[in-house]
Amino acid sequence: MVSNWNWNGMKRRRTPRRGYGRPYKPVVPITRVVVHQSALLKKDEVVGCEIKPDGDVARYKMMKVMLTCTLRMPPGELVNYIIVKSSSPIANWSAAFTTPALLVKESCQDMISIIAKGKVESNGVAGTDCTKSFNKFIRLGAGISQTQHLYVVMYTSVALKLVLEHRVYIEL
C-alpha cells in the first residue's frame, strides 16, 4: 500500500527526530451522486435494480455506495436483499438467484460475486402496515469501473412499496 505513496523531501538532511521526509498519499477528487427510485414489488418474486451514477458520466470508478431503502409492508413479513457485482448485465433475475435465500445459481457463479447482504423483518399490530428502513454503507475496495455492474437484488414474501435511494461516491 505504501508503494504508491510519494516520498517528498529526499534531498533534505536527515535528523533523528524526522527522517528524510514525510510521505503523502495522492488524493483523487471524489464526486457524490444521489439517485432516487421507487417501485412496487410483487409477492415471492426476485427483482433487482442497478446502482450506477445518473446523468452523462461516461468514465468513472465507484469507490463507495451508501444505500438507503424504505419499505411499507404488513407485520410479520420478510425482505431479503443482497448487493452483487457482475461482469455482465443481468437480464433474468430468477435464472441467476435462488428464490428465498438469494444465493447465486451455479450457472452464474463465474460472473456474479456477492458484496453485502441483509434482511428486513416487520413487526407491529396486525391489520396495519408498518414502515421499515435500512441503511447500508458499502466500501468497494479498488472500485467498480463503468464496464462492471453493481446491483441490489431483493426477494419479498409479500407485495409492497419500496423507495430506494443510493449515493454513489465516484472518481472521474
Swiss-Prot record:
One Gene Ontology CC term in the entry: T=1 icosahedral viral capsid
Keyword Metal-binding: no
Major place of residence: virion
Subcellular compartments: Virion
Coiled coil, from the record: none
Entry keyword annotation includes Transmembrane: no
Keywords: Capsid protein, T=1 icosahedral capsid protein, Virion
Similarity-based family: Belongs to the nanoviridae capsid protein family.
Protein name in the entry: Capsid protein
Organism: Milk vetch dwarf virus (isolate N) (MDV)
